[in-house]
A protein has these predicted regions:
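Bacterial N-terminal signal peptides
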Residues: 4-17
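Bacterial Sec-pathway N-terminal export signals of envelope proteins
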Residues: 18-75, 81-82, 119-120, 134, ...
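Small/polar, glycine/serine/threonine/aspartate-rich low-complexity segments that form flexible
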Residues: 20-26, 73-119, 245-256, 288, ...
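Envelope-exposed proteins and targeting segments
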Residues: 25-27, 31, 41, 66-68, ...
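Amphipathic alpha-helical coiled-coil scaffold segments and their short linker/junction regions
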Residues: 35-39, 90-100, 195, 199-206, ...
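Sec/SRP-type N-terminal targeting helices
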Residues: 46-50, 63-64, 105-112, 121-148, ...
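Short segments within alpha-helical structural elements
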Residues: 64, 209-236, 373, 382-441
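Periplasmic alpha-helical coiled-coil/stalk elements that build and connect Gram-negative outer-membrane
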Residues: 148-265, 369, 373, 396, ...
């Protein structure tokens, strides 16, 4: 993971920079680029990768209990001691008669230098702990998949909101253009004596309203650009140019068409379900490691070195130990830990069942939204066509002097609403396609 993250961090900014035509020009960003960058470079993904590295390091920590341990040691000691305190209370026969040992012995030096080594010969609990650490690392990798899928979804939705805001800006610009044309038409009609001053006032009011709505739309687009940069983990000041629009293919992914196939794909690919299964597996392995603590542990230990009162006078000494330990009772702490892991497994099983049902519900909901949005698109497109015809016909009536511009203003308002409805329908369809990809567990493949 560390090497992969380093390569991504090295080459991804260069790849993005290559898309920039000139210094200060906006960064051209497609929908697929946004999803790809977010799923590989977003801060949340980097943090998830680091957590995976931490879990892999814990495997090595657990494995250390099964590997040889080697150490070097040396010491110098200068001491005195009371012979009486050690129970040394006897006389030594000499030619001049029995003599007692002096009560104070020393001071004297002691030098010691040696190599210590130990190796577990049988330690099943440590073997089980290594397996548990591996299961936890698998869970961490599954959690990283959840994060990648989530960041891809976040970036996709942020991009959709941005291109929706971009479409709204284009609609409001078109509204302002029409309003300005109507002002010119009203003034011409008034100058020709076939229209009242109120018609000019109404037209100017519509123009001011359209300009105000355009300002709001531009602000929303700027805010949406910031949201996209945050989803990608890049500088919020980065200017972006969105190359995709709310077309019929935006937000597509390679997913099956049939409902049952979609559910099966979700059950097989959804990272949140994989993560839950990994958590249950880790809890089972942890429980197995706890149960293995009841088994005997066999270890061999040895040391070899030199020992003496002086360095030149030191001689070689050694120890060799074969030790077996059998846990008997630890205050029932082990049993309590087992009960905890059993509860964790049962809890995970409940979440797994709920997730399986949620996946089916997500697929059904996304399909309903998609079918509804596609139907809404057809209705919205027809409404937009009729609103444009209504505006054209009302303008002709106003030019001919057979109607006031109130009809034109009403038709213009209808066109504004029709444009918004069309944008909303296309946005809903794209969002439904993204939701369907997320339900199937393939949000990172959106294009």
């Amino acid at each position: 993971m560390g090497v992969r993250a380093s390569l991504v961090a090295l080459f991804l900014p260069a790849a993005l920079a290559a898309q920039t035509p000139a210094a200060g020009a906006p960064l051209r960003l497609s929908f697929a680029d946004a999803v790809r960058v977010a799923s590989s470079e977003a801060p949340a993904v980097a943090l998830a990768g680091l957590r995976t590295d931490e879990a892999d390091a814990r495997i090595r920590q657990a494995r250390a209990a099964l590997l040889p341990a080697l150490s070097l040691g040396g010491s110098w000691l200068n001491r005195t001691f009371n012979s009486k305190s050690l129970g040394i209370d006897f006389s030594i026969p000499t030619a001049s008669g029995p003599q007692s040992l002096p009560e104070l012995i020393g001071p004297f030096h002691l030098f010691d230098a040696r190599v210590n080594a130990s190796q577990a010969l049988f330690d099943w609990s440590s073997v089980a702990r290594v397996r548990a650490a591996r299961a936890q690392a698998d869970g961490s990798r599954a959690e990283r998949g959840v994060t990648v899928e989530g960041t891809a979804l976040t970036a996709a939705l942020a991009y959709l909101r941005a291109v929706r805001a971009q479409a709204v800006v284009a609609a409001r610009q078109a509204d302002s253009t029409i309003a300005a044309e109507l002002v010119g038409l009203a003034e011409a009609q008034k100058a020709a004596g076939v229209s009242a001053a109120i018609d000019v006032t109404r037209a100017r009011t519509q123009l001011v309203t359209a300009e105000g709505l355009l300002l709001v739309a531009r602000n929303q687009l700027d805010r949406a650009r910031i949201d996209v940069t945050r989803a990608l983990g890049i500088d919020p000041a980065t200017p972006l140019a969105f190359t995709d629009t709310l077309a019929a293919t935006l937000g597509a992914a390679d997913v099956p068409a049939a409902r049952d196939s979609l559910v099966a794909a979700g059950l097989g690919k959804r990272p949140d379900l994989r993560a839950e299964l990994a958590r249950a597996g880790a809890a089972r392995q942890t429980g197995a490691a706890i149960r293995a603590e009841r088994l005997p542990r066999l270890e061999v230990a040895a040391d070899y070195g030199v020992n003496g009162r002086t360095v030149p006078g030191a001689i070689a000494t050694r120890d060799l130990t074969l030790q077996v330990s059998v846990p008997i009772l630890d205050g029932f702490r082990r049993e309590a830990r087992l009960s905890e892991q059993d509860a964790v497994v049962r809890e995970s099983q409940v979440r797994e069942r709920d997730l399986r049902q949620q996946i089916a519900a997500d697929v059904d909901g996304a399909l309903l939204d998609l079918h509804s949005a596609e139907a809404q698109q057809a209705v919205a497109a027809e409404r937009l066509r009729l609103a444009a015809d209504e505006l054209s016909q009302s303008r002709e009536r106003f030019k001919a002097g057979v109607a006031g511009n109130i009809e034109v203003i009403d038709a213009q308002s209808n066109l504004i609403r029709a444009r918004d409805t069309d944008i909303d329908a296309r946005f809903a369809a794209a969002t439904a396609r993204v939701s369907l990809a997320r339900a199937a567990g393939v949000a990172r493949t959106l294009h």
